[in-house]
Design a protein with these regions (language model features):
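Acidic, metal-coordinating catalytic segment for phosphate/diphosphate chemistry
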Residues: 1-28, 32-34
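Short, hydrophobic/glycine-enriched beta-strand segments
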Residues: 24-29, 156-162
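Anionic group-transfer/hydrolysis microenvironments
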Residues: 28, 46, 131, 163, ...
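Entry beta-strands of beta-propeller and related beta-repeat scaffolds
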Residues: 38-40
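A conserved beta-turn-beta hairpin within the catalytic core of GNAT-like acetyltransferases
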Residues: 49-53
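Short histidine-centered catalytic/ligand-binding loop motif
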Residues: 55-66, 173
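Unchanged
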Residues: 61-154
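Nuclease catalytic cores that cleave nucleic-acid phosphodiester bonds
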Residues: 155-160, 167-295
Length: 295
């Protein structure tokens, strides 16, 4: 085991004994198999360790200088040889025990990735069908949280009706529609890189400590000439912000995206007709004020 300053036992406010002086984190990666069925990457702990033989996401103690994202990705690489650059993080689940916290970092991959045991702490690694997870002997902490975690395995996509959002701010946008759209995208690039801590109540998902959704901004008309967003200096932003320049009706493009994008979808618009079209696809809809308050 590599020596880290987080290694060691501690007790939480409930009196339970936990590994990780500064808390701990694990990585729960989901990916579709060749038939499109979801699977998650789990490791079986070595028999000699705590909860030996139990299954759960790869994870371990957080070092004092690390974020939970760094810890989870590092542990998955150290224990399962998982390439951290091959997954996309979309959220963080927090399990607070009072003075000690375990965070599950949620991520996705386009397909099951190569993974195998590379540490003495790991007995076996497998991409397990989601429907089969509960039949395994699970780590008690993971077993307690699994039913909720299963509801947030898929990423969240926020589809932004740029014309509607820009038009809700009386800042002279009508004088330069492309410039106004560009300013909105710059703000969204910063927001996308840092994530968001809450969602509207209309979105039917369990509460996460932080979401890292993909933002899809739909531009139309003169605004479609807007420049690409400025780099906010944070690596995750480019992959979390997608620009769609509609060649026809922006509303039609938004409705199409709401119908075909996998996972949870949240459409930002105040247009009543568009709202109704998106809701028929199963997407949630919220007005521009929610998004503007985050910028």
């Amino acid at each position: 085991m590599t020596v880290h300053d987080g290694n060691g036992w501690t007790r939480c406010g409930r009196g339970h004994r936990h590994w990780g002086r500064h808390g701990a984190a694990g990585l729960l990666v989901a990916a579709p198999d060749q038939d499109g069925e979801p699977r998650v990457l789990l490791q079986q702990r070595s028999w000699w360790g705590s909860h030996g033989g139990a299954w759960g996401p790869p994870g371990g103690a957080r070092d004092s200088h690390e974020t939970e994202l760094h810890t989870a990705l590092r542990e998955a690489e150290e224990e399962c040889a998982l390439d951290p650059d091959a997954v996309t993080v979309h959220g963080v689940w927090r399990d607070d025990h009072g003075g000690w916290t375990y965070r599950t970092v949620l991520a996705n991959a386009p397909a099951p990735l190569a993974a195998f045991p590379v540490s003495e702490e790991t007995r076996e690694v497998a991409w397990v069908p989601v429907d089969d997870v509960s039949s395994l002997r699970l780590h008690p902490g993971f077993a307690e949280q699994w039913s909720a975690l299963r509801g947030v395995l898929m990423p969240l996509t926020v589809i932004v009706d740029a014309a509607n959002v820009v038009g809700s701010r009386p800042d002279g946008w009508w004088r330069d529609r492309a410039g106004a759209a560009g300013r909105l995208m710059d703000q969204l690039a910063v927001l996308a890189s840092g994530g968001i801590t809450s969602l509207p109540e209309a979105v039917p998902v369990p509460v996460l400590e932080r979401w890292f959704p993909q933002f899809v901004v739909v531009l139309e008309g003169a605004a479609a000439a807007a420049r690409d967003p400025a780099d906010p200096g944070r690596a995750p932003a480019p992959s979390r912000l997608r620009i769609v320049r509609a060649t026809g009706s922006g509303d039609d493009e938004i409705a199409r995206l709401a119908a075909c994008v996998p996972g949870q979808r949240l459409v930002v618009t105040a247009d009543r007709e568009l709202r109704a079209r998106c809701e028929t696809t199963g997407a949630s809809v919220i007005g521009p004020r929610w998004l503007l308050d985050l910028l």
